[in-house]
Every structure is written in structure tokens, then in C-alpha cells.
Amino acid sequence: MMDGVEGGTAMYGGLETVQYVRTHHQHLCRENQCTSALVKHIKAPLHLVWSLVRRFDQPQKYKPFVSRCTVIGDPEIGSLREVNVKSGLPATTSTERLELLDDEEHILGIKIIGGDHRLKNYSSILTVHPEIIEGRAGTMVIESFVVDVPQGNTKDETCYFVEALIRCNLKSLADVSERLASQDITQ
């Protein structure tokens, strides 16, 4: 881990990327919290990946643990969504607020404000960046978070659990995006 980003930050863009990560993925982490960031490289163009990520009202399009989502009001900054979680996880619902949606910089920020789970004071930032993978348009996705460490758990246990969820979401995002990109190429 370099500057809290798995896989390092200097690989794509050098110092510019390090500065970008420090600017957009810096979370104020209190004593009882943990924070981390993960990187996923996707073999699909940015516009396609962003079209999935930006849909605050439809996280189930790529998040495998979401069965249903209801947005209260229009999907704009400050909007709330009620997410139903599939069985098998230690939760059934999560109430989340859209904190940031920047279509020019490709930044999405979400804060969990309720639900029947242990992710208290959870806040995440997801950014999407163009890159070239194997000579084609690709996308680098960075997702960072901060969350309270539940009583009875360690920082390492909490980070491990949240990182596992994010890895699943990012893998699914890559699978869906790459499938859609291959359909675009063949059509």
C-alpha cells in the first residue's frame, strides 16, 4: 500500500496521480475509525464505466449485494436512497446520502446514514480515470472509505471486511463494464 492506495499510486500519472489521490481520497480518520482505498483497472472506456457508477438510483446494476434501491426524491446531491441488501450479509437495509456527484471530474461521494448494519459513519469516494490498457481505452477506478470500528472488532478486521465488499463491487463493475464494452465492439 502506498499512501493508502492498494497497488501504489505512482504507476499511472506519477506525482499528478499521488496529488489527485491526496486531494480527493483523503479522509479525516479519527481514533476509532479505519480508512483504506482500492484500485481497479477495467478494460472498458471511462464513459461506459461512469454511466454505471453515477447512477445513485441503480447501484444494483453492478453491486452484487444490492437487491433493490429506492431513491427518495430526484437523484441529486443530498438525496437519500434506501438499499435492500441480499441475504447472506449481516444486514438487510442501508440508508445512504449522495454527498458528491461530479460528472466532469467523475467523482461520486456517498455517506451511510442508517440501516441495520454495523457500518457506522461510513463515507466513501469513488473516482474514475481514463487510461490505456493493452492499447485500448480503459478505466482506472479508485474507491476510498472511512468507517467507525465496531465495538469488539479491530481496525484490521473492519478494514478487511469493507475492503472485501468493495473488491466484490469493483470486480462486478469490471465484469459488467467489460461485457457492455465487448457488445459495443461487436455491434
Curated annotation (Swiss-Prot):
- Renumbered to this chain, motif Gate loop spans 87-91
Predominant subcellular localization, coarse grouping: cytoplasm
Nucleotidyltransferase listed as a keyword: no
Disulphide bridges in this chain?
A: 29-159, 34-159
Q: Where is this region: START-like?
A: 27-178
Instruction: Give the matching CDD domains.
Output: PYR_PYL_RCAR_like
**Compartment(s):** Cytoplasm; Nucleus; Cell membrane
User: Which residues of this protein are annotated with the site description Involved in ABA binding?
Assistant: 64, 110, 162, 165
Pfam families from the entry? Polyketide_cyc2 (PF10604)
- UniProt-annotated site: Involved in interactions with PP2Cs, residues: 90, 154
Tissue-level expression reads:
Expressed in root tips, vascular tissues, stomata, flowers, pollen tubes and developing seeds.
Q: Can the keyword Cell wall biogenesis/degradation be found in this entry's annotation?
A: no
Which GO BP terms sit in this record? Answer: abscisic acid-activated signaling pathway
GO molecular function ontology, one term from the record: protein homodimerization activity
Question: How is this protein annotated for GO cellular component?
Answer: cytoplasm; nucleus; plasma membrane
Instruction: Name the positions where abscisate binds.
Output: 63, 91-96, 118-124, 143
Q: Which family does it belong to?
A: Belongs to the PYR/PYL/RCAR abscisic acid intracellular receptor family.
Q: What is this protein called?
A: Abscisic acid receptor PYL9
Tell me what organism the protein belongs to.
Arabidopsis thaliana
Q: Which gene encodes it?
A: PYL9
